[in-house]
């Protein structure tokens, strides 16, 4: 005789809708965490955003100059 398959019960993980503290550490001291990240990485952010803002402003100025040039 062959083996009979055994039915296994599935394990279901769920969060109770009445549970209020799901991730309490995520929102704790949020301004302090943001300040720490910004003060830690300000040089990288400047080096990233500086050329982007410069290029964008140059393109906007160039387009405005082109518009005025073809006005008359």
UniProtKB/Swiss-Prot annotation:
Keywords for the protein's UniProt record, in alphabetical order: Electron transport, Membrane, Mitochondrion, Mitochondrion inner membrane, Respiratory chain, Transmembrane, Transmembrane helix, Transport
InterPro entries hit by this protein: Cyt_b-c1_8-plants, Cyt_bc1_su8_sf
Mitochondrial matrix topology ranges: 2-41
One GO location term (cellular component): respiratory chain complex III
GO biological process, one term: mitochondrial electron transport, ubiquinol to cytochrome c
Location of the protein in the cell: Mitochondrion inner membrane
Residues passing through the membrane, by range: 42-59
Functional summary from the UniProt entry: Component of the ubiquinol-cytochrome c oxidoreductase, a multisubunit transmembrane complex that is part of the mitochondrial electron transport chain which drives oxidative phosphorylation.
Assembly mode: Component of the ubiquinol-cytochrome c oxidoreductase (cytochrome b-c1 complex, complex III, CIII), a multisubunit enzyme composed of 3 respiratory subunits cytochrome b, cytochrome c1 and Rieske protein, 2 core protein subunits, and additional low-molecular weight protein subunits. The complex exists as an obligatory dimer and forms supercomplexes (SCs) in the inner mitochondrial membrane with cytochrome c oxidase (complex IV, CIV).
Protein name: Cytochrome b-c1 complex subunit 8
Native source organism of the sequence: Solanum tuberosum
């Amino acid at each position: 005789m062959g083996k009979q398959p055994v039915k296994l019960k599935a394990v279901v993980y769920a969060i109770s809708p009445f549970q209020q503290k799901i991730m309490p550490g995520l929102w704790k001291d949020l301004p302090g965490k943001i300040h720490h990240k910004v003060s830690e990485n300000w040089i990288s952010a400047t080096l990233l955003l500086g050329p982007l803002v410069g290029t964008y402003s140059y393109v906007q100025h160039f387009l405005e100059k082109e518009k005025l040039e073809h006005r008359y």
